[in-house]
Amino acid sequence: ARQLVPAERIIFNGPCKQERLLTVYEQGGILNLDNPTEVEQLCETVRNGAVPSEHTQVGLRINFDLEAQCPDETTAGTEVSRFGICYENGDLKRAIDQPGEAGIAIHGIHLHTSTKTRSTRVFAALAGMAVKIREEYGLSLSYVDMGGGYFGGQKVTGKPTMEEYAACICGELRK
């Protein structure tokens, strides 16, 4: 796929990508940082002058207490997610401040979850959190990357369609 799509149109996601992190950054790809270690690694590399700070779009994968907003709908329940940068414990604030100090702008937010119900309420909560973070930290975002747990591929009575997910998410993002 990489041969057919320019790097700046590929969002590079996921944990454990340290080895590829700088390659993607140097090629101008969209890079979602998954944890505080990846944030620090990229900031240190930029501070050392290995790559320019404006070289690519950087996003942050964020986790938060979704269960509090959507009780009994998440697969993680009340457990802290092992993926993403935690909003509640201050890690997110540090993950936004550190790149700023290194001259790296945060261009995006990545929110990904797994659900038991696949309801639109979960995705409304994710989109609402994206808006809250954008406003709270004064971010100028180019993208919000949301995934996980969509019901799709077939029409099933009582399950949301892709159009319903899109309407729900866009409605929250426009607020």
Residue spans for each PLM region:
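Active-site-proximal beta-alpha core segment in soluble small-molecule metabolic enzymes
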Residues: A1-Y143
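Short glycine/threonine-rich loop-to-helix capping motif typified by GTGT followed
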Residues: R118-L126, G153-A166
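Glycine-rich beta-strand-to-loop/alpha-helix junction loops that act as flexible
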Residues: H112-T115, V144-Q154, K175
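Charged (often Lys/Glu-rich) extended helix/loop segments that serve as interaction or gating elements
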Residues: C168-C170, R174-K175
